[in-house]
Amino acid sequence: MNPTLTESQTLTPTIQLGKVYVETYGCQMNEYDSGIVKELFRKEHYETTNVVEESDIIFLNTCAVRENAHAKIYGRLQSLGYLKKKNPNLVIGVLGCMAQNLGEDLFHQELPLDLIVGPDNYRTLPELIQNIRNGEKDVQLTRLSRSETYDELEPKVVNGIQAFVTIMRGCNNFCTFCVVPYTRGRERSREPKSIIHEIKQLQEMGVKQVTLLGQNVNSYSYESYDFCALVESILKETTIERVRFTSPHPKDFPDHLISLMAKEDRFSSQIHMPLQAGSSKVLRDMKRSYTKEEYLDLVKKIQSVIPDIGITSDIIVGFPGETEEEFLETLEVVKKVKFDMSYMFKYSEREGTIAKRKFIDDVPEEVKSRRLIELVELQTKISLEKNTSKIGKIFSILIENTSKKSKQELCGRSHCGRMVVFPIPEGMSQDLSDWIGKTVNVLIEQATSATLKGKLIV
């Protein structure tokens, strides 16, 4: 006798339409977008895979911020040619900012490529794949949207106890060096209730810390909600242990955001605050909307309210027209602020940007390289000094994983974003699951420019 089928059961098994492989380049937003793509295909009965050789569809989710990002993708596409020869039905697509930036020009590069889709068009991907399987060639869709936020998809981009949650997309600032407004469109924000629902689901999966993402995260605006109101709602309506955010713009940093960071223990006291340059003239040419003095005043205000704040930054050297004196101004700002860490780059001209149209890339490459070396050396020295000053102090650490160098060492971050490594004490559990996600106190005993090392306080 056959058992009775319930309403949720079906006589026909789900047919898998193929295996999808997604490779991600660039920022945390791209990591989140790759999660959106996987979720879209899962809903359409595709399987996702981490093995490129067994895939039926390969997507490269790309970045367009720097020139070497393009070179990486060209090289990667060429390396995938052998799979296309083995399986002519394999579909290879380029997604993301490079797809949006270069569009159909990618089809003229003699690459094994079937599909080009920009960040605002991912909902169409399953349909576009079907069109390709029906014989359509060189499929491209790169329309920008003023409304798409993928609100209901909630891809759950989880790394252990941490997760990213995109709260807004796009950028309205049009910094002259930046391609993002042209590849991701204008700013639009997700509904607060959708964001909070996603965080609650992440909590149920064991996530302890979420990082709120946006190209200009603190310019979040949805009806009556600004960024502070959103964070307050998250802290009130969830029990998530830590809330971080990246990347803010200095022009959108009101006093009540600083007060909220000082007041709320669960709101991480760490800020990634892009400087980009230390000269007001260069900042004006970059269209950054603040002067050197305004940036320094903001940092001084933040540090006065939150003395142990962790501040990191982005800095570009060799922007068109940057003189030696203007570069020295950048070094002076770095010395005054004493960033915990910085991402430092040589200026590279990007197709489609205002700087490409308006300025001549006139700083010689050897000068850019020398300035970058000087800046990196200064930042490394400051990072070491700051970390060395923490020796003898005790920090509350949220354990994330084992350290890269040893399975007998655990690592995690302090409330201010500092990476701390410490050994598992003898006689205590060596089972990683007993440690991950726990908050412990660690006494700092050693320091490098990147890491604090210590021992567990039992």
Swiss-Prot record:
Domain Radical SAM core: 157-385
Reactions accelerated catalytically: N(6)-dimethylallyladenosine(37) in tRNA + (sulfur carrier)-SH + AH2 + 2 S-adenosyl-L-methionine = 2-methylsulfanyl-N(6)-dimethylallyladenosine(37) in tRNA + (sulfur carrier)-H + 5'-deoxyadenosine + L-methionine + A + S-adenosyl-L-homocysteine + 2 H(+)
Record carries keyword Nucleus: no
Key word Cytoplasm present: yes
Bound cofactor: record note: Binds 2 [4Fe-4S] clusters. One cluster is coordinated with 3 cysteines and an exchangeable S-adenosyl-L-methionine.
Localization of this protein: Cytoplasm
Top-level taxonomic group: Bacteria
Enzyme class: transferase
Binding site for [4Fe-4S] cluster 1: C27, C63, C97
InterPro entries found in the cross-reference section: Elp3/MiaA/NifB-like_rSAM (IPR006638), Methylthiotransferase (IPR005839), Methylthiotransferase_CS (IPR020612), Methylthiotransferase_N (IPR013848), Methylthiotransferase_N_sf (IPR038135), MiaB_methiolase (IPR006463), rSAM (IPR007197), rSAM_horseshoe (IPR023404)
Molecular function (Gene Ontology), one example: metal ion binding
Enzyme nomenclature, EC number: 2.8.4.3
Record Pfam families: Radical_SAM, TRAM, UPF0004
Major location category of this protein: cytoplasm
Signal peptide range: none
Domain TRAM positions: 388-458
Family: Belongs to the methylthiotransferase family. MiaB subfamily.
Subunit structure: Monomer.
HAMAP family: tRNA_metthiotr_MiaB (MF_01864)
Protein name listed in UniProt: tRNA-2-methylthio-N(6)-dimethylallyladenosine synthase
Source organism: Leptospira biflexa serovar Patoc (strain Patoc 1 / ATCC 23582 / Paris)
